[in-house]
Amino acid sequence: MSQNDIIIRTHYKSPHRLHIDSDIPTPSSEPINQFARQLITLLDTSDLSSMLSYCVTQEFTANCRKISQNCYSTALFTINFATSPIHTENILITLHYKKEIISLLLETTPIKANHLRSILDYIEQEQLTAEDRNHCMKLSKKIHREKNYTPNSKSQW
């Protein structure tokens, strides 16, 4: 990983949590708040920054403290995106983005990004795919209903 690479992956025991691995060094002498600010600076390249920054400040402290005490050189912290109970068989993440709730089914392959922009692109693509799926399902239901009309009913075509 290069210095600004970020890996986002789901936790294997808690699919409603995301782990973000970053190569930003966290020496034990560095104050936690300073490290959080440094990390948020990385996130500022994306429209997701405000949402992520909020999550980081809420859940960052305890995890970062453990890292500092153990003098790890790589930061590993957890951000919880879950807003509702999640079935264990699904790795489903719900994100609040632009006042919408987006459900993501993440692959087991980590998302690597020199820029958080590619994560945003991934999310938007997933959203478009979901919208296409919903449109196709609605269309298919409509066609199914029209095929099942009784002979006496008038066709809409």
From Swiss-Prot:
Designated name of the protein: Putative ankyrin repeat protein B
Organism name: Escherichia coli (strain K12)
